[in-house]
C-alpha cells in the first residue's frame, strides 16, 4: 500500500527494476584520517576494527546490490572492497576499465594525493573508484536511471543528534536533475523505518529531503551540464537523477556501536533497496526478516564513549555474546545468531519464509527469554528483547 500510494503521489510508473541501471556509491574507501575514523568502546580511533565510514557504507551498498540484481537491475558500484593501492600502482597510475567497459578519460590517472583509492580489480573486473571527480565521470559515462551515494553523518563526538538526511543537487524542491527530489521522497519512509535506532529529528511523514545548495550553501553551477565544486562537500557533481543519503549520525555513540555490526548495516541496505524498488514499481519480496537488539531489562549503559538520549531505548545496556536461537513452527532450531562484543546487541535473520517462529535468548548471567514472532513477506519484524539478570 505504501509503494502504491507513493507511486500515485509522485507519478512513478509501475515498470519494475528489470533493465534499470542503478549506480551505488559507498562513500569513502580507505582507512585514512579522511575516512571518518572514530574511537569506539573496544577500539582506538585509527584501529581498522574501529569505526570507519568506509566499511559500514560498503556493507550497506553490497546488500542493496544483492537485492537489486536479483530483481533484474543492472547494478554498478563505484567500489566493492576497502583498502589502498600499492605504491607501485600509485607510481604507475594503473587503471582498468570497469566491469561494464565504460572507461574513464584516458588521461585521468590515479592521483597520488588520494592514497585511499583502492586497487583496480576485485577479481571480476570491477574498477575501484573513490575520487569524487572520477565517480562523477563514471556516472556521466554510464547515465544510470538512479544514483545513490551512501554515507553516515557527523556532529560533535558524544552528541545525541541522530537523524536521516537526503540531499539532491540543487535547491530544495528544485533539483537540477528531474525526479531526484521524487526519488528521495519515495525512499524516505522505507529508510526511516528503523526502530533499532533513536531519531532526534524528523519523522516518517516529515522528511528531510533537501537540495545541497539550500542545505550547505555554495555556488549553483549555472547549468546542469557543468561539473562544479559546489553544494554538499562536492559529492554531488554528477549529471544524473539521484541523491546522497546520510543514513544516521556516527557521532551518536550508540549508533556508532551499531554500525560496527555488518548485519545492522545490511538492514540499512535492505531499506534502500525497498525504496528504490518502490520508485520503479517493483514487485514485493516473498521472504521476510527478523532483526533486533538484545538489552538488559535493568542495567543502564555507562561508558565515556556511550552518551545516549535520555529516556530512549539506548539507555539500556546492550548484551554481548547473547545466543539467539530461531525455531520454526514445528519447534525445530533452524538458525542461531551470536551477538558480537561491540556493545550493540544486534541480531538479524534474513530471507525467511513467512510464518510463525519462536526466538530463544540465552546469555551468561541473565534469565532465558522466549518469545513468539510472525514473519510477514517483504517486511522486517523488529524486536527489542530485554533480559533480566539472575
Regions found by a protein language model. Name each.
Residues 1, 5, 9-390:
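Catalytic-site microenvironment of enzymes
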Amino acid at each position: 500500500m505504501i509503494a502504491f500510494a507513493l507511486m500515485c503521489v509522485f507519478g512513478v510508473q509501475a515498470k519494475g527494476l528489470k533493465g534499470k541501471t542503478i549506480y551505488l556509491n559507498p562513500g569513502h574507501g580507505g582507512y585514512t584520517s579522511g575516512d571518518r575514523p572514530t574511537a569506539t568502546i573496544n577500539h582506538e580511533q585509527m584501529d581498522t576494527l574501529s569505526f570507519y565510514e568506509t566499511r559500514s557504507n560498503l556493507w550497506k551498498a553490497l546488500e542493496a546490490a544483492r537485492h537489486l540484481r536479483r530483481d533484474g537491475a543492472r547494478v554498478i558500484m563505484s567500489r566493492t572492497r576497502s583498502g589502498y593501492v600499492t605504491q607501485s600502482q600509485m607510481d604507475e597510475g594503473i587503471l582498468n576499465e570497469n566491469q561494464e567497459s565504460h572507461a574513464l578519460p584516458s588521461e585521468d590517472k590515479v592521483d597520488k594525493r588520494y592514497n585511499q583509492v583502492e586497487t583496480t580489480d576485485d577479481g571480476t573486473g570491477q574498477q575501484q573508484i573513490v575520487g569524487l571527480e572520477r565517480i562523477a565521470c563514471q556516472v556521466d559515462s554510464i547515465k544510470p536511471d538512479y544514483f545513490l551515494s551512501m554515507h553516515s553523518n557527523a556532529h560533535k563526538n558524544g552528541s545525541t543528534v541522530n537523524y536521516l538526511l537526503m540531499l539532491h543537487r540543487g535547491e530544495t524542491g528544485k533539483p537540477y536533475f528531474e525526479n531526484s527530489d521524487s526519488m528521495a521522497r519515495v525512499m524516505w519512509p522505507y529508510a526511516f523505518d528503523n526502530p533499532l535506532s533513536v531519531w532526534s529529528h524528523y519523522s516518517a511523514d516529515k522528511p528531510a529531503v533537501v537540495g545541497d545548495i539550500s542545505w550547505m550553501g555554495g555556488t549553483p553551477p549555472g547549468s546542469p551540464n557543468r561539473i562544479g565544486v559546489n553544494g554538499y562537500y562536492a559529492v554531488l557533481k554528477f549529471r544524473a537523477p539521484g541523491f546522497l543519503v546520510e543514513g544516521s549520525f556516527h557521532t551518536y555513540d550508540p549508533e556508532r556501536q551499531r554500525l560496527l555490526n555488518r548485519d545492522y548495516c545490511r538492514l540499512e541496505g535492505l531499506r534502500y533497496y525497498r525504496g528504490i524498488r518502490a520508485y520503479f514499481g517493483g514487485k514485493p519480496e516473498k521472504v521476510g526478516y527478523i532483526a533486533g537488539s538484545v538489552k538488559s531489562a535493568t542495567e543502564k549503559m555507562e561508558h565515556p564513549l556511550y552518551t545516549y538520549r535520555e529516556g530512549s531505548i539506548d539507555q539500556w545496556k546492550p548484551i554481548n555474546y547473547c545466543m539467539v536461537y530461531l525455531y520454526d513452527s514445528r519447534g525445530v532450531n533452524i538458525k542461531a545468531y551470536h551477538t558480537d562484543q561491540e556493545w550493540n546487541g544486534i541480531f538479524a535473520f534474513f530471507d525467511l519464509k513467512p510464518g510463525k517462529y519462536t526466538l530463544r535468548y540465552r546469555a551468561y548471567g541473565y534469565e532465558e527469554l522466549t518469545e513468539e514472532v510472525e514473519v510477514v513477506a517483504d517486511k522486517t519484524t523488529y524486536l527489542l528483547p530485554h533480559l533480566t539478570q539472575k
